[in-house]
Amino acid sequence: SPTCIPSGQPCPYNENCCSQSCTFKENENGNTVKRCD
């Protein structure tokens, strides 16, 4: 089974994250990317 994505790492879907939560965050460049909470 695939391992879960840790907090702060880019993610496609909530289910991919260890926290089961993937939300849009703004990075240092001002771009918005989905990362695990």
From Swiss-Prot:
Keyword tags: Calcium channel impairing toxin, Disulfide bond, Ion channel impairing toxin, Knottin, Neurotoxin, Secreted, Toxin, Voltage-gated calcium channel impairing toxin
GO-annotated biological processes: defense response
Organism, scientific name: Hadronyche versuta (Blue mountains funnel-web spider)
Any one GO MF annotation of this record: toxin activity
Marked site (Critical for insecticidal activity) residue numbers: 10, 27, 35
Subcellular location: Secreted
Tissue expression remark: Expressed by the venom gland.
Protein name per its UniProtKB record: Omega-hexatoxin-Hv1a
Note: When expressed in tobacco plants, the toxin induces a 100% mortality of insect larvae H.armigera and S.littoralis after ingestion.
UniProt record similarity statement: Belongs to the neurotoxin 08 (Shiva) family. 01 (omega toxin) subfamily.
InterPro entries on file: Omega-atracotox, Omega-atracotox_CS
Function: Reversibly and voltage-independently blocks both mid-low- (M-LVA) and high-voltage-activated (HVA) calcium channels in cockroach DUM neurons. Is lethal to many insect species but not toxic to mammals. May target the insect high-voltage-activated calcium channel Dmca1D. Also inhibits acarines calcium channels. An extremely high toxin concentration partially inhibits Cav1.2/CACNA1C, Cav2.1/CACNA1A and Cav2.2/CACNA1B calcium channel of rats.
Any single GO CC term annotated in Swiss-Prot or TrEMBL for this entry: extracellular region
Consequence of changing residue 35 to A: 4.4-fold decrease in toxicity to crickets, and 15 to flies. Abolishes toxicity to crickets and flies. 280-fold decrease in binding affinity to cockroach membranes
UniProt cross-references to Pfam families, sorted A to Z: Omega-toxin (PF06357)
Cystine bridges: 4-18, 11-22, 17-36
Outcome following mutation: residue 9 to A: 4-fold decrease in toxicity to crickets, and insignificant decrease to flies. 16-fold decrease in binding affinity to cockroach membranes
Reported uses of this protein in biotechnology and industry: Spear and Spear T (Vesparon) are biological insecticides containing 20% of the active ingredient GS-omega/kappa-Hxtx-Hv1a. They are effective against thrips, whiteflies, and spider mites in greenhouse settings. They have a large molecular weight, are hydrophilic, and have many hydrogen donors. They kill some insects on contact. The peptides block two ion channels in the insect nervous system (a voltage-gated calcium channel (Cav) and a calcium-activated potassium channel (KCa)). Could be considered as a biological insecticide candidate, when fused to Galanthus nivalis agglutinin (GNA), a protein with the potential to cross the insect gut. This chimeric Hv1a/GNA variant shows a gain in toxicity on insects when administered orally (tested on Mamestra brassicae), while maintaining similar effects as the wild-type toxin when injected. Transport of fusion protein from gut contents to the hemolymph of insect larvae, and binding to the nerve cord indicate that the fusion with GNA permits to deliver the toxin to sites of action within the insect central nervous system.
